[in-house]
């Protein structure tokens, strides 16, 4: 793995440790590959507002083994609120989908929904979830990758998270760390 990252200039290797660099390029490349895999997305409608849906999902998740996690724009709003969004985006573990839909009284729709449930194609999106303001959300890395695959304002929201969570070090900072 380290040689893969080094070959693409995505790590700065010193004699005792290595650090990620060119993080923006790394995420854009990663997102391109990641979005070739298909996760199932289901659309629903709720009479509740998006913030109410997100709050209900967070409360539900606490009593269901963290089986529902905010992702996409819903997670981005917790990390770096920069864009408005109209839909609650929630990862729900496959074994919990039916119960989640029933408990939150969601109605399936083909278009015009205000809730998007993503059933992940692997465990990665939920594996590194973290609490932000008492709500479980996808990791900053997963959130960025999801947003980069989203048309519209996704890239803008992803860039805000990249700036906040993964600030690039300047060349001067790198030289100082190396002692040059």
Which positions does each model-derived feature cover?
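A short, conserved structural fragment
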Residues: 3-16
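Short, cationic-aromatic polyanion-contact patches
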Residues: 13-36
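Conserved phosphate/pyrophosphate-binding and hydrolysis machinery centered on Walker-type P-loop NTPases
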Residues: 20, 90, 134
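A conserved hydrophobic position in a structured secondary element of the catalytic/binding core
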Residues: 21, 92, 139
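A generic structural signal for short hydrophobic patches within well-formed alpha-helices
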Residues: 26-27, 97, 144
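Short, well-ordered secondary-structure micro-motifs
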Residues: 30-31, 57, 103, 128
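Short gly/ser-rich loop at a beta-strand->alpha-helix junction or flexible surface loop bordering the NTP-binding
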Residues: 37-122
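C-terminal regulatory/effector modules of DNA-binding transcriptional regulators
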Residues: 103-180
């Amino acid at each position: 793995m380290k040689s893969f990252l080094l070959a693409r200039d995505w790590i700065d290797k010193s004699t005792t440790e290595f650090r990620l660099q060119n993080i923006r390029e790394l995420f854009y490349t990663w997102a391109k590959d990641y979005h070739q895999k298909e996760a199932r997305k289901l659309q629903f409608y709720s009479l509740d507002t998006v913030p109410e849906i997100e709050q209900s999902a967070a409360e539900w998740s606490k009593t269901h083994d963290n089986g529902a996690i905010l992702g996409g724009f819903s997670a981005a709003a917790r990390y770096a609120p920069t864009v408005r969004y109209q839909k609650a985006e929630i990862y729900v573990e496959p074994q919990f989908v039916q119960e989640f839909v029933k408990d939150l009284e969601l109605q399936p729709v083909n278009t015009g929904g205000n809730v998007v449930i993503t059933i992940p194609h692997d465990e990665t999106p939920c594996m590194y979830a973290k609490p932000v303001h008492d709500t479980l959300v996808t990791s900053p890395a997963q959130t960025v990758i999801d947003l980069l695959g989203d048309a519209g304002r996704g890239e803008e929201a992803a860039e805000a998270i990249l700036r906040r969570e993964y600030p690039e070090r300047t060349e001067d900072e790198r030289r100082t760390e190396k002692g040059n």
